[in-house]
Amino acid sequence: MNPPDIFEVTLKVIRVFEKLNIAYYVGGSLASSAFGMPRTTIDTDIVANIKPEQVFLLEELLKNEFYIDADMVHNAIRYQSSFNIIHSEMLFKVDIFILKERPFDCQALSRRVQKTVSADTSQKIFFASPEDVILSKLEWYKMGREVSDRQLNDVLGILK
């Protein structure tokens, strides 16, 4: 899947979030590529502040193009964890992490930055700030027993 396809799928999800007034930001490899060295990725990571009362409409608005399981979404909200949705045609996965109540996560949401993602300057999405991408990558590196060069290379790419 090439970058325009990745952004096309990501934008579909984000437009639904915006329609439902769900605060979000893109993190992970897509964010580190936006601020540093581009690299291939197999998914999009989005942090979102989804509330239980938004799940029904979220499922309704996504189910024609994505596989989405409302029970998984409710469980992710309950346990402040994650769930994924898969684009039916492109088979591209979007991992959605529920915003945790940790001070860092709440601050990261307030520090998110909007960037243009295509030649059409109206196509803008919120990304985690470069500093928050670095901190998140270092946290994932530590949780992964400090063996993933990908996380460190992403950090170095942003710092350059």
Where in the sequence are the language-model features?
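Compositionally biased terminal segments of proteins
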Residues: 1-160
